[in-house]
Amino acid sequence: MIQQALLSVSDKTGIVDFARALHGAGVKLLSTGGTAKLLAESGLPVTEVADYTGFPEMLDGRVKTLHPKVHGGILARRDLPEHMAALSQHGIPTIDLLVVNLYPFQQTVAKDECTLADAIENIDIGGPTMLRSAAKNHRDVTVIVDPADYATVLAEMQANGNTVGYDTNFMLAKKVFAHTAQYDGAITNYLTSLGQDKSHSTRSQYPQTLNLAFEQVQEMRYGENPHQSAAFYRDLKAVDGALANYAQLQGKELSYNNIADADAAWECVKSFDPAKGAACVIIKHANPCGVAIGGTAQEAYEKAFKTDSTSAFGGIIAFNVPLDEAAAQVVAKQFVEVLIAPSFSAGARTVFAAKQNVRLLEIPLGKGVNAYDFKRVGGGLLVQSPDAKNVQSAELRVVTKRHPTPKEMDDLLFAWRVAKFVKSNAIVFCGGGMTLGVGAGQMSRVDSARIASIKAQNAGLMLSGSAVASDAFFPFRDGLDVVVDAGASCVIQPGGSVRDDEVIAAADERNVAMIFTGTRHFRH
């Protein structure tokens, strides 16, 4: 039974109402510093920990709760007579409920003006110590680190005579250890990112020790293949608009491959500004098999589908605008695994209600960019900044005698945007705001060029006057010759080959406009 609670919080959201409810249930309140002041000002009877222990706060508040009367009351096992006898001998009451959250270390070090001294002063000592003590003794002590759990604990207390059950205490204890692990990980990340001069301004993006925190979203029936086990975890620092923030509106449980392909689709479609029109991306095996823009979601989908209707079967489809009923009726004619949009109209929901196997994912658009991209290798982890660079007009360099027309320039920029999301080696034919042929993942760039032109031919799409994007430079003129032979009139590529002059001369020879971006977009 909860008879005495200690409350000491940095995040004071809801703490007064929670404390008032505890007081109403007959629970004695202990507190520290600012929390005690707030509770007292709110008319609640509260005992300062310094008065409770008979030992004042000292060292500018560094020592407040590190006292046997606090930790003894938390750690004593109620089922061990010798523990309870020790408490009685020393006049220590039990503390049955602990509510603590920690100094805002991560928020502090995120500030540009933060100094090492600021960071050090925001390393909480007493808070984690109490939390770990209470979580260790969770059979007897209820511990709360998250204000979102106040209502759960109060409801259980009210239903069970001020008692919280073991299952709830165990759940809360797990949250505590996860929280303190993340807290210590953030401290380690920060301290090991500092340079020799310990200056905040010279912090490395890549600390010597990297601690990451993820929480499980689901265990899966299997992984990439049926003989592999799998689970999906969400980054605790997932940015706005990240796939991991999806809300599934209907459909079967997402598979490992569904999530991998959905991420590719969502990242690609997010690169198109919805203010400039609707965009649709169709993904198969992590590669775009159709991308298009249009005046409406329906138009964008119909154009994207034309690129490769065969590969689109059973694909993942993403939109950068809300999906309305008109678009839904057209998409519903196709077998689709996952459909993603910022929102779905009531009419669209009704259309897909008859197709309950289709997974609908709603993800609000966001401009956040993940801090890191990861790739696991044997015994290690490759870490890099995300490929978030968008080429600016000032960076574009026309290297041929002929300049692209305004229409060609629009097609080139569209093709370049798509090529970034195609597995290397990538060649993409585009025209009229849609992909016409995609060559992906070949060991030879010239083979990717051939495949892209063949795919367009198979789809009955004309490549005459089309634009081509290559994710990396053409090492020889042969790749350029293949795309021009297929009908391309203009090309966009990074440049940077030792044979750039040869490729430029070939473009001039064939009256093709070519642009260098100076940026490569390898994708593996």
Swiss-Prot record:
Name of protein: Bifunctional purine biosynthesis protein PurH
Record domain MGS-like: where: 1-145
Hydrolase keyword on record: yes
Pfam families linked: AICARFT_IMPCHas (PF01808), MGS (PF02142)
Domain of life of the organism encoding this protein: Bacteria
GO BP, one annotated term: 'de novo' IMP biosynthetic process
Gene3D superfamilies with a match to the protein in the record: 3.40.140.20, Methylglyoxal synthase-like domain
HAMAP family noted in UniProt: PurH (MF_00139)
The protein's annotated pathway: Purine metabolism; IMP biosynthesis via de novo pathway; 5-formamido-1-(5-phospho-D-ribosyl)imidazole-4-carboxamide from 5-amino-1-(5-phospho-D-ribosyl)imidazole-4-carboxamide (10-formyl THF route): step 1/1; Purine metabolism; IMP biosynthesis via de novo pathway; IMP from 5-formamido-1-(5-phospho-D-ribosyl)imidazole-4-carboxamide: step 1/1
Family matches, as SMART domains: AICARFT_IMPCHas, MGS
Gene that this polypeptide is encoded by: purH
InterPro entries documented for this protein: AICAR_Tfase_dup_dom_sf, Cytidine_deaminase-like, MGS-like_dom, MGS-like_dom_sf, PurH-like
Enzyme Commission number(s): 2.1.2.3, 3.5.4.10
